[in-house]
Amino acid sequence: RGLGDVYKRQGETVGLNPYRLSLTFGVSASFLKKLGLESKRPKIFRDLPPFPKEQLQDKYTGGDIVIQACADDEQVAFHAVRNLIRKGRNTITMKWSKSGFAAIGDRKETPRNLFGFKDGTANVTTEKDFDKVVWTDSKDWMKGGSYMALRLVQMHLETWDRTNLQEQENTFGRYKESGAPFGKTNEFDEVDLSKLPVDSHVRLAKEVDRPILRRSYSYSDGINEQTGQFDAGLIFIAFQKDPNSFVKIQTNLGAVDKMNEYITHIGSGLFACFAGVEKGGYLGQALFE
């Protein structure tokens, strides 16, 4: 009995192709401690510190293992995670799960978040940039891996929708339609910080000058029973070779980011993501051996 039996028995992906399915795995500092591997924890790898304005909920914070499944078909991604969890039911307990989405379009445009602004304009794109920003160059088990900073961000859409366009653009420091920074014409034009409001999101993030790779997705979970408003927002995911890059950015955003009027950080985690698997090897081999 092989995986084909599972495929046929569950049936949810019969007739579907892989739709560019990819899986990313990571572990937290608590994972290393629970398995007696704390001596192998890199010095830069520790839980994220508290940040101003966040209202973290225990159910969305921490955890020992993270699995990110991405595919062009949500059912394919869910099927992959479902079967991984099924294999470990006697060993693990699920903490939380969120289904995210991003506008595909023609794949040439930067996707927009639920506020209608382009999200990920300043991402690294070249192999050289990835080596400089994303992949660790450490000599230990994290060689070739990356650190994932994960934040669950609730977006207050009703408040945002009552805000005029100029105020929305001032919040970001970019024009909504084109994505261009203030004072410029095109989305990817170099940002002139002097043209941006001092409390704008882009200016505060750019002041730190610590590039990261954003792989964020929007989410929608129906209605918040307490507020009667949409339970929706952003699954913010950033990869970097040094977690301090994200920490410095988020610290600078701090309490002065105008965006905080429209969002609340409710979940958080930091995970060390393994490098790819060599032929004949297994995930995390360098850590466990």
What are these regions (language model features)?
Residues 1, 5-289:
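Long, histidine/aromatic-enriched segments associated with O2/redox biology
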